């Protein structure tokens, strides 16, 4: 009974987050080829993030849980609580998360508890033995029970035989599947044919019909009556969970997503079976081993779930800001700072060059004024300066001149004539901005040169030394 593998201990998950790896990564792995019976073996197996935990060798009964998965009083209370919740925000069930975690991980650390020749489930599906305790063969169930909704509703011992699992259910006469039995079952066409007929029978009981060999489903003819019954008989949600698990065990993993998508659509979009939405999101979705398929279904559900703020099965909120930060911080701040640095460097270089230019011009001008006799050129405007003033200048030079003349003017010598070039207060104060503007104006340089040449002409004493 549930013998542990020698020397290996399985660490039980302790939180819902430990059990659920659906949103651990957004990378979508490449799809793989489906298994031989259209399902589970070829698809991406769920949650390989814990390689140190070996998969179960075969499907023995899981370690004793507080309550068996199929127990109506325990699991039914969780799966059937939708109608009483109203608008209250739902909560994730640790019991459900742990149970489905073990299922998706092939029941780790447990060995087969039966001999390989004890193929009770396969022999039942080969019509060799009846299911216990009722003593009914599979052919009678498929032929006489089909459409008898009262019998299918009130009998609680057949479902474990029709959809066997590697875990104990409510009917203790039913035998758990083993790994060897699963492989033999898939090889037996007779068993597979009857298994699909049993699946169709139960779908019709729920008001659903299988429409093709890929697992797509649609509403049955009597869907309105059966949906109303399904919405009110919440113990059938346990049966749907078991059916989904069994599909995955016996090679029809690919049949799960179409059925779950259909149920989510009817519950959230059409509102025909609203009471099932909690079980669909908490149980049905998480029977699917492929993370990609789970993400697709949960995104669809989130789009239609109301109120949207009560949807608790999406990606964790703490991961979203981290991704947005990583996307927003490539190189923009670095470029901005580099741009500012280069601008400052350019302005500093221009200020330094303009300051040096003005110092040289100022030194020449002071020497010139010092050598000049007081009042000598008071009434003699420079012809060169006059001719220079008469030349047309472009608008840029005018703007530069206006800006340089905007502060109050101060001449070096109060007796200087109109022909002398004005020296602004910015030249005396040495402010960088106006100095850089003056250094860029070619008129100031030419004006100083003209004054020097004029001084040499009008003051022969100075020129002669």
Swiss-Prot record:
Report keywords, A-Z.
Answer: Receptor
**Start and end residues of each stretch annotated as Disordered:** 1-89, 309-465
Annotated Pfam families = OGFr_N
Q: Does the keyword Ribonucleoprotein apply?
A: no
The UniProt regions of compositional bias labelled Basic and acidic residues, in chain numbering, are 48-59, 316-325, 363-396, 426-440
Disulfide bond entries: none
Q: Does the keyword Chloroplast belong to this entry?
A: no
Return the Polar residues bias intervals. 442-465
InterPro entries attached here? OGF_rcpt, OGFr
Annotated GO CC locations: membrane
A Gene Ontology molecular function term of the record: opioid growth factor receptor activity
Look up the signal peptide feature and give its range: none
Its family remark reads: Belongs to the opioid growth factor receptor family.
Q: What name does this protein carry?
A: Opioid growth factor receptor-like protein 1
The species this protein was found in: Rattus norvegicus
